[in-house]
Amino acid sequence: MKTRSFEREIFIQSDAATVIDVIADYSQHPKIYTLIIKVERSKQESDGGKRYCITDTLKWGPFKFKTQYWVDIISVTGDTVYTKVYRSPGTFVTNLTRITPQGSGVLLHESITMRAPDMLFEYAFQKTKATYSEMLERIKGFVETQT
């Protein structure tokens, strides 16, 4: 298994509560991330709170595959969202999102750590980095058109 971390941030013209609500409400995520097909709330809760099963599309060259992963929302406060993601085989991602007021909006800062099997790691890590960068842009666009 390998582990590596990265960070991303973006300025959003909105208030902290709105951004936190969008990030923590996974029923909104199909509007934000186009590869998500379905979001289902699990009847089994995680240790900290809500658990979701996400069905999305994995692109590999000209091929598309449906995949599933699980998201546990560990905690939500007025300025943070902490989640853990599990995708088979043995891939784990933790995400601590912090919201800091800045001027006329907020700075959304994500600290992401991924752990995955050695053979999958480089591919999965690069896809994860690209996905999170794209998601930040989409969150920004979604939130700013809602306010």
Question: What is each PLM-predicted segment?
Answer:
Residues 40-88, 134, 138-146:
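Glycine-rich portal/gate segments that line the openings of hydrophobic small-molecule binding cavities
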Residues 3-9, 51-53, 68, 80, ...:
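Intrinsic-disorder/low-complexity, polar/charged segments enriched in Ser/Thr/Lys/Arg/Asp/Glu/Gln
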Residues 9-11, 72, 98-100:
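Generic structural detector for well-ordered beta-strands
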Residues 84-134:
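Beta-strand/loop substructures that line and gate deep hydrophobic ligand-binding cavities in soluble
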Residues 14, 77-78, 103:
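Residue-level signal for tight coil/turn positions that link beta-strands
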Residues 1-2, 27-34, 59-65, 86-90:
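Short, solvent-exposed secondary-structure boundary motifs
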Residues 1-48:
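Hydrophobic ligand-binding cavity/cleft-lining segments
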